[in-house]
A protein has these predicted regions:
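Glycine-rich phosphate/pyrophosphate-handling loop used in enzymes and phosphotransfer proteins
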Residues: 1-189
Length: 189
């Protein structure tokens, strides 16, 4: 069972199931970049657990019925961060969407890439924030829609914070953030 824990990045509390190190790091890297789609079987459960924790933290107790249930209830949508065009071409699938489907959940396709941001690997905290600034846009109006943002790995939080901005700009409200894993690298400016 994963050790779901809160991660704070700027003013955001993000629920993460794993720490991106050791076996978790190898499994996630193999799944995302090594073509090991079979690793989804091991990774879907931890991501689901992070989403359950995010739902449990929503004011009004929208966590669902019973321990471990992931019943978002009416109006709460699971919104993933869209893959870059390059990543889609290389992989042929969107890793987080595939994990949600494997966990019996359904992503709500609310966001699109406005600009093709650089790969975040190797960028520091400030460079990541600048790289992601205004890179996402909502595909439609999100007026009145409650959202839990879901991503694979949180480092500095730049991607999730940009997604939160894009959802708010379209009229939606982010009520939670969940990730498969968090890494503690690159937390200094």
């Amino acid at each position: 069972m994963p050790s779901v824990h809160p991660v704070v990045r700027d003013d955001a509390v993000i629920w993460a199931a794993l720490t991106y190190e050791g076996a978790a790091r190898h499994a996630i890297a193999a799944y995302k970049d090594g073509g090991r789609t079979d690793a989804a079987a091991a990774l879907a459960g931890p991501l689901r657990a992070a989403i359950v924790a995010a739902l449990a933290a929503v004011p009004g107790g929208r966590q669902g019925r019973g321990a471990g249930r992931c019943d978002a209830g009416p109006g709460i949508q699971l919104v993933t961060i869209p893959s870059s065009r390059r990543a889609w071409r290389v992989r042929g699938y969107h890793p987080v969407d595939a994990l949600l489907h494997r966990a019996g959940l359904h992503p709500f396709p609310a966001l699109a890439q406005r600009t093709e941001a650089l790969d975040q690997v190797g960028l520091g905290r400030a460079a990541r924030a600048a790289n992601k600034s205004n890179s996402l846009v909502a595909r439609r109006s999100l007026d009145g829609v409650l959202v839990i943002l879901v991503d694979d790995i949180v480092t500095t939080g730049a991607t999730l914070l940009e997604a939160r901005r894009a959802v708010a700009a379209a009229g939606g409200t982010v009520v939670g953030l969940a990730t498969l894993a968090e890494t503690r690298r690159l937390l200094s400016p």
